[in-house]
């Protein structure tokens, strides 16, 4: 039997276990069930073929939490072999990836039951299962991380087609759905896919694909990726190795690898095109053009592109300035307010915000639509400026929060760790690292205190996991 046929047959056995143990109750369509079986089998294939990808989970977890996996008791754990805890974690991740508005308990009894049976199958097969030489040879290539083009291809594979990629793939598909479908859709989608491969951290340990592959291949090197936003550039010089570009906004001169420009587009250089709008990616000290470019000579197109860039840069500058103002004048890293009068007084009298026409009505509408009984907490960070937490305020145990309520917090504090709609990632990290969500707990058949300890022992991991999409 060929290696492919062996693992296909094994995946069918895993699928049968998922069906018989009730996983279909949460993965409610046949495609999702088959996909889960394939991913779990691919994990086993990785374990049997050098344990290259999954070893990163163990390494990073030890670095961050002092044990080989989050959530589970690993006192009886054997790295590089089939472990029920590994299968539980991966199956939990697969199931959780399908739920945006529901938290699945990693100790879910159905997941544990399925993982136990699957682990038994893998244990039986472990000594005789074939290694996948193609995967081992692919990851053993010494240039897979250092060479930009090989690295880009590997990152696309990891972010969309590896057994660890489900959340990353779902995110990209959702991003495609949000785009207007017009003549530019496929060009935009191509760029989005490439950039996603470089910057997404939607994997179990919240690393980028490059970081994961670097660790998996045991190459001790720093991966320096600079994600530059779309920009406008004037072409100053075309060379054999690099283009010399000038940023149309900042005036900064940049050298970009010539090989990264589309060969068909290069022919249009003869037409005298001197300005382009594109995405640049910095990889290990060199700049590459990534995705599609706009090189329309019409003045109105250029002005429209530049306007969008200026607006984005202005928002970034305002965020940094707002953060500095908050740090200087707020009086505390987090401030609790209630009602429109307190909210406006804090903005105008404390932070020095100028009250423009309609400011009060705008703030009243915001509090009415977003806050619970007019209660909000305010913070800041340099990337987003002022941050407002508008829900579950009584769940925050801070010395200066007059509305903290333990009974309320026991039911609602978890939301502030996992629901990005309620607050920014920076705010969630601040609350966790400063011990302000001590009552957060998962519902557990073993009681509230067990569910609380499960969350508290894995609080930072949970924030990073559930907010990963919103910190890319």
What are these regions (language model features)?
Residues 248-250:
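Surface-exposed loop/turn elements that mediate protein-protein interactions on large endomembrane-trafficking
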Residues 1-231, 282-472:
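Mixed-charge, low-complexity intrinsically disordered regions
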């Amino acid at each position: 039997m060929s290696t492919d046929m062996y693992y296909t047959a094994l995946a069918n056995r895993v699928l049968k276990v998922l069906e018989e143990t009730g996983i279909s109750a949460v993965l409610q369509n046949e495609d999702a069930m088959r996909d889960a079986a394939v991913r779990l089998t691919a994990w086993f294939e990785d374990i049997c073929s050098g344990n290259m990808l999954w070893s990163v989970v163990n390494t990073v977890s030890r670095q961050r939490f002092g044990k080989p996996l989050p959530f589970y008791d690993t006192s009886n754990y054997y790295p590089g072999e089939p472990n029920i805890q590994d299968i539980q974690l991966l199956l939990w991740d697969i199931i959780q990836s399908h739920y945006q508005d529901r938290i699945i308990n990693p100790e879910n009894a159905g997941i544990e039951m399925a993982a136990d049976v699957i682990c038994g199958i893998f244990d039986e097969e472990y000594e005789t299962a074939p290694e996948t030489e193609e995967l081992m040879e692919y990851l053993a290539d010494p240039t897979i991380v250092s060479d930009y083009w090989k690295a880009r291809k590997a990152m696309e594979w990891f972010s969309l087609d590896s057994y660890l990629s489900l959340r990353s793939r779902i995110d990209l598909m959702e991003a495609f759905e949000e785009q207007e479908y017009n003549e530019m859709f496929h060009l935009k989608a191509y760029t989005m896919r490439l950039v996603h491969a470089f910057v997404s951290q939607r994997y179990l340990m919240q690393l980028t694909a490059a970081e994961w592959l670097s660790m998996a291949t045991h190459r001790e090197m720093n991966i320096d990726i600079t994600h530059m936003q779309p920009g406008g550039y004037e072409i100053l010089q075309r060379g054999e190795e690099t283009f010399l570009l000038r940023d149309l906004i900042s005036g900064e001169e940049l050298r970009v690898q010539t090989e990264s420009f589309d060969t068909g587009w290069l022919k249009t250089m003869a037409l005298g095109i001197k300005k382009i709008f594109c995405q640049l990616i910095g990889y290990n000290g060199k700049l590459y053009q990534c995705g599609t470019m706009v090189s329309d000579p019409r003045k109105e197109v250029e002005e429209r592109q530049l306007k969008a860039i200026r607006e984005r840069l202005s928002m970034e500058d305002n965020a940094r300035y707002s953060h500095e103002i908050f740090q200087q004048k707020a009086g505390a890293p987090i401030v609790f307010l209630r009602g429109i009068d307190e909210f406006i007084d804090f903005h105008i009298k404390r932070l020095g915000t100028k009250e423009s026409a309609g400011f009060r009505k705008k703030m009243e509408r915001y509090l009415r639509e977003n806050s619970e009984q007019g209660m909000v907490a305010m913070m800041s960070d340099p990337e987003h400026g002022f941050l407002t937490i508008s829900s579950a305020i009584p769940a925050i145990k801070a010395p200066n929060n007059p509305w903290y309520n333990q009974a309320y917090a026991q039911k609602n504090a978890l939301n502030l760790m996992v629901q990005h709609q309620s607050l920014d990632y920076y705010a969630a990290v601040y609350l966790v690292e400063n011990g302000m969500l001590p009552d957060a707990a998962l519902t557990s058949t073993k009681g509230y205190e067990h569910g609380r300890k499960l969350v508290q022992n894995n609080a930072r991991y949970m924030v990073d996991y559930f907010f990963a999409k919103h910190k890319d």
